[in-house]
């Protein structure tokens, strides 16, 4: 089989504690982790079925006409620490329709788990964040959840979620979704990072926004000489909160022989937005094999020269561990 090399260091550890690992971060929120990611899609039920079937997510909760929600339907899935919500508008005048018309299916909400949603909202808005939703208390028989939201790049939203006084399956207004169809999980553990694509010369603006508004730190940067192909190039800076649980790389286009992949995204998506969600696994070989067997398609395998060049790219980094594994 071909040789695959892996890198492991303190930044890529599988489990983060709440202690601060990035000294430059202000950590005035602080953030406990990713609470959920909400996609606005044309057919939420179909999307949920796909993520269950192909990726091994489990049914958690539902809100829609049957629960008294008249304008949209939402299906909540979970695998280990990952929660995805798929939402479809049900009325012609829903503003969610505008999101679908402009962007197609895409991420609207990156929700962040916090100890105090009101404090998180106040700390970020006083530093310049644009308000999406004022702090709101939502209650049912299982307790209460406090949520508040701010805008980030494009039409993307960060929702602060405080659930320390709640014991329900997801949020008030949702009912437990019991399904007879429960494919086995595929080893997906948690959201490792989420990448935002922004326009030409906007990367540093949003890097500063995450530093000033969210208290993040830029701990890794790539220029167009490091991330480039024969035809396409990009620039990227990686932002993190203090404990390393939330990492947001910010990409912008760079000049190349052809249009940058980031510019292509901006053209097709209709502006800035979440480009991809990276998910951690303890065993990538087993997980990818399982996903392939369920019909998930991956990029073609890089040539051997890619793997041969890994040691030279890494150099003598003392925090890196290289080892070789055969993969069929």
What are these regions (language model features)?
Residues 323-328:
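Conserved small/polar residues in nucleotide/adenosyl-binding loops
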Residues 34-38, 57, 84-86, 107-110, ...:
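Short, structured motif recognition centered on aromatic/hydrophobic residues
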Residues 1-6:
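Short, Lys/Arg-enriched N-terminal segments with co-localized hydrophobic residues
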Residues 62-73, 90-109, 118, 127, ...:
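A cross-kingdom feature marking solvent-exposed beta-strand/loop segments within repeated
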Residues 8-45, 107-110, 169-207, 270-279:
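N-terminal beta-strand motif that seeds the catalytic metal site of vicinal oxygen chelate
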Residues 8-153, 161:
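An N-terminus-focused feature that recognizes amino-terminal "leader" regions
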Residues 107-109, 132-226, 237:
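Extended catalytic-interface subdomain
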């Amino acid at each position: 089989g071909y040789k695959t090399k892996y890198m492991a260091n303190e930044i890529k550890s599988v489990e983060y504690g709440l202690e601060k690992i990035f000294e430059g971060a202000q950590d005035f929120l602080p953030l406990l982790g990713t609470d959920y990611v909400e996609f606005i899609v044309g057919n939420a039920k179909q999307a949920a079925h796909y993520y269950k079937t192909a990726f091994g997510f489990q049914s958690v909760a539902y809100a829609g006409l049957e629960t008294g929600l008249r304008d949209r339907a939402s299906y909540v899935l979970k695998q280990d620490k990952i929660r995805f919500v798929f939402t479809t508008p049900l009325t012609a005048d829903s503003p969610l329709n505008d999101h679908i018309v402009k962007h197609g299916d895409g991420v609207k909400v990156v929700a962040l788990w916090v100890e105090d949603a009101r404090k998180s909202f106040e700390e970020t808005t006083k530093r310049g964040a644009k308000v999406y939703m004022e702090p709101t208390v939502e209650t049912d028989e299982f307790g209460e959840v406090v949520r508040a939201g701010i805008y980030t790049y494009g039409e993307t939203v960060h929702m602060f979620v405080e659930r320390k006084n709640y014991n329900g399956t997801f949020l008030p207004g949702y009912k437990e979704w019991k399904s007879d169809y429960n494919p086995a999980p595929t080893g997906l553990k948690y959201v490792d990072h989420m990448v935002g694509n922004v326009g030409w010369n906007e990367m540093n603006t949003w890097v500063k926004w995450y530093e000033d508004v969210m208290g993040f730190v830029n701990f890794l940067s790539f220029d167009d000489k490091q991330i480039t192909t024969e035809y396409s190039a990009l620039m990227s800076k990686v932002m993190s909160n203090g404990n390393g649980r939330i990492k947001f790389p910010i990409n912008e286009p760079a000049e190349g022989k052809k249009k940058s992949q980031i510019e292509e995204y901006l053209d097709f998506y209709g502006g800035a937005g979440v480009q991809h969600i990276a998910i951690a696994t303890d065993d990538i070989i087993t997980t990818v094999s399982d996903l392939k067997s369920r019909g998930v398609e991956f990029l073609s395998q890089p040539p051997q020269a890619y793997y041969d060049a890994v040691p030279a790219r890494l150099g003598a980094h003392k925090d890196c561990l290289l080892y070789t594994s055969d993969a069929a």
